[in-house]
């Protein structure tokens, strides 16, 4: 499957025009990386949100990390979830749910009570989340079934990125094995997709933006690795973490329609 040049161009142009504002419920260390992913993909960052109507209306995406929800901030997060409109998008990162037992019921509660548009995690994390609802389905069917039941889009990070809205299934390559700083890489990707979905008004637009931003991220990885290989042996990668990270961000900022369309290899399946 290949995305059309018109759809890619429309999404990238709208991204630059709107500059979606992402509110990150994150610690300072993670926020530093997230901010770079968001800004380099034409978004704006907000780490503190006043309770004024204007502040809430200006927010495009609410980004929540499950492993950062604490007793002292859960009330503020829930207030934000209750205040946002249907035009605003919520992204939940399930990082740590498979390891932190007391976070599982919290995640389940948030999904049941609020409109969570996009849920991201590893296969282990998403499987843990799905197991809270049902244990009867086969793996791929449970991913689609979970997305359909909860009216959300799932992103599963593995050897390939798996994206489903409950009906369509998409697979896009992942190239993170060449990057020594995996946490930085994951935070950048999360920032990119948080920015990308901030322009969306419905689920189909969310899927389209996720496909484009995930492709852009993969291509940026390939390009930055290519630049490194021209200068260093593979053994020197770990000694140049900052440089490869900077190359990645530069390639993200330069991404255009032609480059995404020229690649465009997406595995696609549809089931009712």
Where are these regions (language model features)?
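Conserved phosphate-donor
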Residues: 140-181, 222-225
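Glycine-rich phosphate/adenosyl-contacting loop at the front of the ribokinase-like
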Residues: 1-39
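Short, small-residue alpha-helix embedded
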Residues: 128, 181-218
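Short, well-structured alpha-helical segments that form the helix of a local strand-helix-strand
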Residues: 139-147, 204-222, 245-249
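Active-site cofactor/substrate anionic-group-binding motifs, chiefly glycine-
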Residues: 29-86
């Amino acid at each position: 499957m290949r995305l059309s040049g018109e759809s890619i161009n429309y999404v990238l142009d709208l991204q630059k025009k709107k500059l979606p504002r992402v509110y990150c419920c994150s610690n300072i260390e993670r926020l530093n990386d997230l901010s770079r992913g968001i800004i380099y993909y034409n978004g704006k960052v907000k780490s503190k949100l006043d309770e004024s109507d204007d502040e809430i209306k200006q927010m495009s995406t609410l980004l929540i990390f499950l492993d950062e929800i604490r007793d002292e901030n859960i009330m503020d997060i829930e207030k934000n979830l209750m205040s946002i409109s249907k035009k605003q998008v919520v992204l939940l990162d399930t990082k740590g749910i498979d390891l932190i037992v007391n976070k599982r019921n919290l995640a389940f509660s948030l999904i049941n009570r609020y409109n969570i548009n996009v849920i991201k995690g590893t296969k282990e994390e998403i499987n843990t989340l799905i197991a809270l609802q049902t244990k009867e389905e086969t793996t791929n069917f449970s991913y689609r079934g979970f997305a359909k039941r909860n009216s959300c889009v799932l992103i599963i990070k593995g050897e390939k990125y798996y994206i489903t809205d409950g009906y369509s299934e998409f697979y896009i390559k992942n190239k993170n094995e060449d990057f020594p700083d995996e946490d930085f890489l994951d935070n950048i990707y999360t920032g990119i997709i948080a920015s990308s979905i901030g322009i969306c008004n419905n689920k189909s637009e969310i899927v389209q933006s996720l496909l484009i931003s995930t492709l852009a991220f993969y291509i940026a990885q390939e390009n930055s690795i290519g630049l490194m290989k021209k200068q260093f042996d593979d053994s020197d990668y770990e000694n140049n973490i900052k440089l490869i990270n900077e190359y990645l961000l530069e390639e993200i900022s330069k991404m255009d329609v032609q480059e995404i369309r020229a690649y465009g290899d997406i595995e696609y399946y549809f089931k009712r």
